[in-house]
């Protein structure tokens, strides 16, 4: 998603509307998004990571944890993506579950999920802040939360 957004904003002259209403749905980009949102592939990655832990413990653990986080992400994605749903069971199926609710679209309750996500991020940031030792990392955490809050206010409130 970050590569897509970087390409669309820095490498083209597309408007924000063109990026999210057109380019996002191009088959090339959908295939890439669906690859990284595939529960079967993530399960294979977890299995490979667990197997690899016997030979390369740090690499195997990293792979298993990253792929497990993909699965967790997909379990949140499934009930919160409407017309922008992913093929979460690819390559076994091309089915897309189009939820009646959306994590971002205000017409489908997105403002409630976004508010929950913002509140969760702020609460967890208070917890994480105590772990951070340097002023730089603490400042980056505060900055990212202010950025998150700004986007929330701009998109849902103002």
Task: Provide a role label for each language-model segment.
Residues 1-158:
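N-terminal membrane-targeting hydrophobic helices
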